[in-house]
Amino acid sequence: MFSSRKRRVAKRAFNAKSKKFPIGEVVSTRKRLKQNTNTPPHYDTSEDEDEDNYYNY
């Protein structure tokens, strides 16, 4: 009985680890973080360019 409980706990811990850190998810979150950090400056620069064009006209 005790060994089966041990096995169950170990299995649960392994499942939790694999759910938290699968390779694909880590890559996708890194990509998402890169997109999140990169997109606001792009939007800001495009808005600034639009404003500059507006003021130039």
UniProtKB/Swiss-Prot annotation:
Protein name: Uncharacterized 6.8 kDa protein in LEF8-FP intergenic region
Lineage: superkingdom: Viruses
Organism (species): Autographa californica nuclear polyhedrosis virus (AcMNPV)
Ranges annotated as biased composition (Acidic residues): 46-57
Residues covered by region (Disordered): 26-57
